[in-house]
Amino acid sequence: VKVAYYSPLPPSRSGVADYSTLLLPALRERIDVVVAEEGKRAPDADVALYHVGNDPDAHGWIVDALMKRPGVVVLHEYVLHHLIAGITIGRGNGRGYLDAMERDLGVAGRLLGLGVLDNLLPLLWETQPERFPLSGVVLDQARGLIVHSHYVGERARSAGYEGRLWRIPHPVWPHGDVVPATDVSGDPLIGCFGYLNMNKRVPQVLEAFASLRRRLPGARLLLVGAAGERFDVERRLERLGLTEGVQRLDYVPEERMWSLMAACDVLVNLRYPTMGETSGSVIRALSLGKPLLVSDVGWFSELPDDVVLKIPVDELEVALLDRALEFAVEHGAALGAAARAYVEREHALPQVAEAYASALEVAAGGDAVDDAVLWRIAEAATEVGIDDAAGLARAAIDAGIVS
């Protein structure tokens, strides 16, 4: 089978770009893959594979290609409101945005969209994206769907997707022996990696860490990642008296990130609300055998209880986070061993690549069968004098004879 592969790739600062850099070599060992390039002619292939995330800069051109040729979609996160707004409103196509809102939410959605376009409502993709996912536009074009979690698969089905669906875990990086960074330290050193904003529960992490540091004065917190535009990290650190206990680093290259993570005693990766994403940072942390704290939501809830410490998002979040940090420090060896064993068993790159290859072979074969059936319908219609062959084809699709 020959696959046209649509994905952001480095130097794009995208988690999906990192994902594809990992997956592509293993996938090419199993099937013929042609990587599509933005602005270039679409490759000839038996089936197209589209990696879709929520960033319009990274994924807008991929959705453009999907609209021209349906194919297998890898849905890296369920909430796509920012993406859809970017490729509609961002291009001066307000009507496209209204259509997407109506597709998911009916007439009420269209009215909400009008409120946004008329500046009567705040930008929904900034204020409440989880309430208005707008993934239906993409799901309608999917001839097959690959997800990383039961959570996203169930939401896709609830949104009306009825086609083929495969759940394929996020692969783990074969990292070998990572040398821990020597320019960061703490007793213990707590690490928090990724974009710093309210959704990543950074305020709650800082509050819990301030409490932990009163008991463990040698503790230090390492924050790695760019901060949101309206998220003033430094001011929060001053208010909590943490200017001496926290080290801040901006975006770092892949190799540097690995070494920083390896230097940490405990890692924290919280988020709420979830957009249905799977976290590459979590997979990295588990593969390093690090004790890890996550929010008890979405895909993170599906991780085994003996592998991660799950923090409920409620009024007890900060208190539980504080105690969980201390527990992770004390039981780091056992938690880390369970984490490493889990990802090596469930997220191994060869088995992930094999699952992709199998899914794409099924999708390509299914498409070929569907095309043959539709061609025979058209041929038979002509033989008996029926002019509306296209109408018969649509009826066959509606009846589930072909997809």
How would you name each of these model-derived features?
Residues 151, 171:
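Carbohydrate-associated surface elements
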Residues 340-345, 349-403:
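C-terminal amphipathic helix plus adjacent low-complexity
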Residues 143, 261-276, 290-291:
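Acidic donor-binding loop of glycosyltransferase active sites
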